[in-house]
Amino acid sequence: MTASDTIARLEAQVARDPQSADGWRALGDAWTARGNMAAADAAYAQSIRAATRDPELLQAANALVAGELAVAEPILRARLKRAPTDVAAIRMLAELASRLGRYGDAEKLLARVLQLAPGFRAARHNYALVLHRQNRAGDALAQIDILAAEEPDNPALANLKAAVLGRIGEYEDALDLYARVLERQPAQPKVWMSYGHALKTVGRQGDAVEAYRRAIALEPGMGEVWWSLANLKRVTFDAADIAAMQGALEQDDLSADDRFHLHFALGKALEDAGDYAASFAHYAQGNAQRRAMVRYDPDEIATHVTRSAALFTPAFFAARQGYGCPTPDPIFILGMPRAGSTLIEQILASHSLVEGTMELPDLPQIAARLGGRKLRSQDSAYPEILADLSAQECAALGEEYLERTRIQRKTDAPFFIDKMPNNFLHIGLIRLILPKAKIIDARRHPLACCFSNFKQHFARGQAFSYDLAELGGYCLGYTQAMAHFDAVQPGAVHRVFYEAVVDDLEGEVRRLLGFLGLPFEEACLNYHASERAVRTASSEQVRQPIFREGLNQWRHYQEWLGPLKAALGPALVDYPFAT
């Protein structure tokens, strides 16, 4: 049978049965083999429409909605083994990869979808989102513009574009875009929520609360909005709010995403009300549900610390004197999340010579690329691969980091801050490729810090934080990693204890600026008056003078923190400030 005969047969088949996803997909494959990509795209588009009635794909889709990723994945992989060009299934597998934070895998899958079916608009939207989450703003905006050419008034596209603009610090443009969309189409709860996020970032708390409330009025069960209100830290829920959240949890059709967000929000509401037992129960449920949705190997941190300690010795660094890019611009603030890094950033960003940015993903992405791991089951070549890098390669990597982060710099200040906390995993890389960069370790009492993590739902990353024992193990690994670098590179890392800052703000600020080689400026003590945008969970706390309340909030919950204390072990014993 000739290719033309095959196409004629398949066209006759789909004419008889237009709901056959397999028939349309086979026709798309046939047109692809003939090189007629326009006809293939049209056939794949019909396959996508027909697939919405496919029982197998519906089962996978329902599992994704319910957050049952372990159920969805084998269905989709079996499907693609039989039909490798099923673009609907490939797109769903990409969604699964994205949910797991495997954005590189998701990107490859979506690129394949768009190669087969360039007119698959939902896949292109997913592609833009994945590019955005990998900090590739220019590429994401290019995909959004392709979609917007046909749908200029699509609120979902405008919402994503505004989020991308906000990610690169173009906050006013993002706010203007949100406002224009909502003026035309006010019944958009997700856009109101995103607008609230942007308003919070620039310090317009009252407007953010109003935007979040507009979203709730449109969709009362939208868990992320309730959590966003709770996450403002300075909003107190009333009895009606608590009843509304409890009522939403009773809905049978509530999504897994809405459900765990509501548990976190109710945990905060009941904590503020002083009902600590009920509060902890909700925090525990929210964390357990979120933990079931993420992949995390608690042994990875200990393995990484052991491998790093074996590699990064005094002899290793002595043999590489003069390696790397000598630019002194970056200031890395790292450590555990919720340890005071945003406070340190706000203090330093109030200095005339320092620009604050955000938690930049560029260094971990460079490390991941060096590791070369394609599958989670594979071993990473990182950090040992660093021993093979030449002086020129180290300099090139330092220059790459500076180029990648340039889009975040909006002023002519000579220094800028990267406050990705997890960069403590990459101190060896920093010292190798950016030897003149400064490194600051933000510390807070392990129980206060870890329980603050447990109460916090992170939009992405920090998968270690959803189980008390795993959280303690991660914190222990962090302290061991820092102790190693203190031993092999004394003085390379400046440590700032949150408790010391509370006790003596000016003294700690002067010591910090001295480490950075910067003159003292009074503005650093009045950091809370800064109008700069702040994107992290501590955004509202750093807009007020320093407070002591956060030091002992964990004590209300200490009867439930046994697994955390046991896992922390020596990290708890060795902390220099008493509880």
Q: Where are the model-predicted features located?
A:
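Alpha-helical solenoid repeat scaffolds of the TPR/TPR-like class and their adjacent stem/linker regions
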Residues: 1-410, 579
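PAPS-dependent sulfotransferase catalytic domain
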Residues: 168, 202, 211, 216, ...
